[in-house]
């Protein structure tokens, strides 16, 4: 036979490779469409001739062979439906089998088991009681050595099925179908249907454990379909694709009765005598009342479970194991316990347990006989102080709480009155947020709120905004003990702080009028202090049970007129123009926090609770948030709070030794204060201007030691800070370069800093006079616009008296009697900077 020049199926005598592949795919689609419609083409003889020549065509590449194989799969379905005469059918099937061997091993291909319907029906009866089996499309058996298998089948519209039926994939291990392990998918095998992976049956979405039949209706096509299994099975499996229906459970299931084991008389004293057993009438699956008590036919226990709960659970995940003894109990092994069913019908609804004796008698135990009373869990609102004040006693289990920390669970506290917090005041227009305390629970781990903080570093005529990351190390010791604005706070006020108004500021005008009548006396809170301090000392092992009384302050928070303690008072800066960084310590590690750039007058309140700390006194004039360094057990913790305080320079020391050191009286440009992070430090510049030093230390139970700091630092200074023995030094632009430790910086005087040089050669430095002179970077004169050319530097030091007097005369910054003016600086001045090169000589738009 010779193929005609033009065929009605689209084939011609001569084809190139691409045209041949496209024609094969088109012919396969036409055959599949005819099979789906259950129709037979008219010119079968011509089609048989074309297919015979296609199979005999020499295919050199794998792509062409795959296309021809796809066409032959459709032709095989047509042969099975009787499209061709007997002789042509045998010839085509022989050619197809020959080509099939090139894509699959012939020894691994098994048509089907002897009775697939019987085996699948048994599996459905045992493990899929809600599934009804329909027409089986294809079934075959995979052997343990099988690695790659293919099976084709066809679907037509005239197949016996209902529109509601679905097509499911069944994978069953044939060695033992009595347990649910037989429906576990082989973990090393992936199934593909028409080239697409089947959900939960491929290696990328494999599901362990027993599986339900997989719905593959969306992956099928009318006509020929191809199922592929790739991987090692490791056992004998039955794979089948069949129509199935999902049916509901019967209202009255036909179940067999449970046969109780016979009680054998005991003649030996060594036999165990069974006593009464307590049986729960609640299902162990849902903890609800049992409706139909069932258990497995091999179960030996008396406890039953509900039939409906058990079946519904296994229809979602068919594990089919007893919830009490974990034995395999498939659907056909479920038995009804008629004895317990009779008990459920006779007892009332309030019965929770029954006691069944060995002779069959039983007795009801109701819920009222329970000795254990459930304690509801209490959720506390950390923002509501009444959450803990109204907390009642909590019942605990002594057996559970043996190894837990012994702490009191009953808190008897009272809300602080508003009058106690504010004190008498004549100003009725002051914002309420100025009197709000930081309110935190003593059980909170994050004791203080954390705000994003930035540092505005002055660099030439620009400000560089440097974000800082806050790292809080919480420990049992660092509990919520924030300070209020009162210099003599009570422990009740210390324990309660309010984070809601964090960031509230007070204008400078109101801050300057803030009267000392708002100061809360410790004596007013002593009635509420003893029980709280006893609780605190019980938890943290303190001996002191009450803070010593503190003197009252009645005028502008000005405590300068009080009699000083044995400590010698030193001047403290009164005005800080830019954010300043102070020391923060968490658990023997110091943490440096930058204050927000919008804060014009930061202030530090170093507080020490029972430890030794080196604190720096604080400036006196504050119009915006301040920094509260708090020390718990020898560790310093500085937190920023938003209280508007004008003249508060108090160093509080409770039960420890405080080392107070004044800060420089005038710092006009950049300055970096040392900080330590667990033995490691990093320097970051800050802009500050301190013109009015003032110190008012108050000491409670300690011996402060105050030492002066340099009186004037007029230019940027780099202060290296030790990181566990490693110094990381960062130069500020246009400033002098120096290297100090924390204690060396505190002991600096103008006399010993004028000609300071490092004691040893610094690592990485290049000495002059060597062959590397050309690599030394020399400072250059800063370039300024012609319109703003600064005058030549007057001298290496200048007298800032005029500048200081200008700020003293400013009405927003009150001056006390002990304010001092900044002296002249003995440090060298950078080239190009003099009186006009200071920060205050810059235009306002560059601040």
From Swiss-Prot:
A GO cellular component entry from the record: nucleus
Superkingdom in the source lineage: Eukaryota
Pathway named in the protein's UniProt entry: Protein modification; protein sumoylation
CDD domains linked to this entry: SP-RING_PIAS-like (cd16650)
Sorted UniProt keywords: Ligase, Metal-binding, Nucleus, Repeat, Transferase, Ubl conjugation pathway, Zinc, Zinc-finger
Region (7 X 23 AA approximate tandem repeats): 569-728
InterPro entries found in the cross-reference section: Znf_MIZ, Znf_RING/FYVE/PHD
Tissue: Expressed in leaves, stems and flowers, and, at low levels, in siliques and old leaves.
Main location: nucleus
Gene Ontology molecular function: ligase activity; SUMO transferase activity; zinc ion binding
PANTHER family associated with the record: E4 SUMO-PROTEIN LIGASE PIAL1 (PTHR10782:SF68), ZINC FINGER MIZ DOMAIN-CONTAINING PROTEIN (PTHR10782)
Protein purpose: Together with MOM1 and PIAL2, regulates transcriptional gene silencing (TGS) independently of changes in DNA methylation. E4-type SUMO ligase that promotes SUMO chain formation in a SCE1-dependent manner and thus contributes to a pathway for proteolytic removal of sumoylation substrates. Involved in stress responses (e.g. osmotic, salt and abscisic acid ABA) and sulfur metabolism.
Family that this chain belongs to: Belongs to the PIAL protein ligase family.
Entry protein name: E4 SUMO-protein ligase PIAL1
Organism per entry: Arabidopsis thaliana (Mouse-ear cress)
């Amino acid at each position: 036979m010779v193929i005609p020049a033009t065929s009605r199926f689209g084939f011609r005598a001569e084809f190139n490779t691409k045209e041949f592949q496209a024609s094969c795919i088109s012919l396969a689609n036409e055959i599949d469409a005819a099979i789906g419609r259950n129709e037979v083409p008219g010119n079968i003889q011509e089609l048989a001739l074309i297919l015979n020549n296609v199979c005999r065509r020499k295919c050199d590449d794998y792509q062409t062979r795959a296309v021809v194989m796809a066409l032959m799969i459709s032709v095989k379905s047509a042969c099975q439906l009787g499209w061709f005469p007997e002789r042509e059918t045998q010839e085509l099937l022989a050619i197809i089998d020959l080509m099939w061997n090139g894509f699959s091993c012939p020894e691994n291909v098994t048509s089907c088991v002897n009775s697939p319907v019987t085996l699948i029906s048994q599996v459905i009866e045992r493990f899929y009681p809600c599934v009804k089996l329909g027409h089986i499309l294809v079934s075959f058996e995979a052997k343990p050595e099988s690695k790659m298998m293919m099976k084709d089948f066809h679907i037509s519209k005239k197949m016996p099925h209902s529109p509601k039926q679905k097509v499911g994939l069944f994978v069953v291990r044939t060695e033992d179908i009595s347990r649910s392990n037989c429906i576990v998918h082989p973990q090393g095998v992936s199934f593909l249907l028409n080239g697409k992976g089947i959900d939960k049956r491929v290696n990328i979405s494999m599901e362990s454990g027993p599986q339900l039949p997989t719905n593959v209706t969306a992956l099928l096509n009318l006509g020929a379909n191809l199922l592929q299994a790739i991987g090692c099975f490791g056992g004998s499996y039955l794979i089948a694709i069949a129509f199935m229906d999902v049916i509901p459970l019967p209202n009255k299931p036909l179940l067999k009765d449970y046969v109780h084991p016979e009680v054998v008389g005991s003649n030996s004293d060594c036999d165990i005598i069974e006593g009464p057993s307590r049986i729960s009438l609640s299902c162990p699956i849902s903890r609800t009342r049992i409706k139909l008590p069932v258990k497995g036919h091999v179960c030996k226990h008396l406890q039953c479970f509900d039939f409906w709960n058990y079946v519904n659970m296994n229809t979602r995940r068919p594990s089919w194991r007893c919830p009490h003894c974990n034995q395999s109990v498939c659907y056909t092994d479920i038995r009804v316990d008629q004895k317990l069913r009779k008990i459920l019908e006779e007892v009332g609804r309030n019965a929770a347990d029954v006691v069944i004796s060995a002779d069959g008698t039983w007795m009801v135990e109701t819920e009222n006989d329970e000795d254990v009373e459930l304690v509801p869990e209490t959720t506390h609102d950390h923002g509501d102080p009444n959450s803990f004040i109204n907390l009642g006693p909590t019942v605990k289990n002594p057996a559970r709480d043996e190894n837990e920390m012994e702490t009191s669970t009953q808190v008897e506290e009272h809300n602080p009155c508003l009058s106690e917090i504010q004190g008498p005041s004549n100003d009725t227009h002051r914002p309420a947020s100025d009197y709000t305390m930081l309110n935190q629970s003593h059980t909170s781990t994050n004791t203080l709120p954390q705000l994003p903080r930035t540092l505005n570093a002055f660099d030439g005529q620009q400000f560089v905004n440097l974000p800082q990351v806050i790292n809080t190390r919480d420990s049992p010791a660092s509990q919520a003990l924030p300070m209020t604005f009162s210099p003599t706070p009570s422990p009740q006020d210390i324990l309660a702080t309010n984070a809601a108004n964090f960031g509230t500021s007070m204008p400078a005008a109101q801050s300057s009028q803030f009267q000392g009548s708002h100061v809360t006396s410790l004596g007013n809170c002593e009635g509420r202090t003893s029980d709280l301090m006893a609780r605190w000392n019980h938890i943290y092992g303190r001996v002191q049970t009450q803070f010593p009384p503190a003197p009252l302050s009645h005028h502008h928070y000005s405590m300068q007129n009080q009699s000083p303690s044995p400590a010698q008072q030193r001047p403290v800066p009164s005005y800080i123009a830019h954010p300043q960084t102070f020391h923060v310590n968490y658990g023997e590690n110091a943490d440096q926090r930058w204050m927000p750039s919008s804060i014009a007058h930061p202030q530090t309140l170093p507080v020490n609770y029972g430890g030794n700390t080196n604190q720096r006194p604080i400036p006196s004039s504050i119009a915006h948030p301040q920094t509260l360094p708090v020390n718990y057990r020898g560790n310093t913790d500085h937190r920023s709070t938003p209280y508007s305080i004008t003249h508060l320079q108090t160093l509080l020391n409770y039960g420890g030794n405080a080392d107070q050191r004044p800060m420089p009286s005038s710092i006009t440009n950049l300055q970096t204060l040392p900080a330590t992070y667990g033995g490691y430090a990093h320097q970051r510049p800050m802009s500050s201007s301190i013109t009015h030093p003032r110190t008012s230390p108050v000491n409670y139970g300690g011996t402060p030691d105050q030492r002066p700091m340099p009186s004037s630092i007029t230019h940027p200074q780099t202060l290296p800070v030790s990181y566990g023995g490693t110094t990381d030094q960062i130069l500020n632009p246009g400033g002098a370069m120096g290297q100090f430790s924390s204690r060396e910086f505190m002991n600096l005087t103008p006399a010993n800093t004028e000609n300071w040089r490092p004691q040893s050669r610094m690592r990485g430095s290049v000495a002059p006079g060597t062959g590397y002179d050309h690599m030394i970077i020399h400072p250059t004169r800063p370039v300024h616009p012609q319109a703003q050319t600064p005058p030549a530097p007057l001298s290496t030091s200048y007298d800032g008296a005029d500048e200081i007097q200008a700020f003293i005369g400013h009405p927003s910054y009150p001056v006390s009697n002990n304010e001092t003016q900044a002296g002249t600086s003995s440090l060298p001045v950078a080239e190009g900077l003099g009186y006009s090169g200071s920060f205050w000589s810059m235009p306002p738009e560059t601040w």
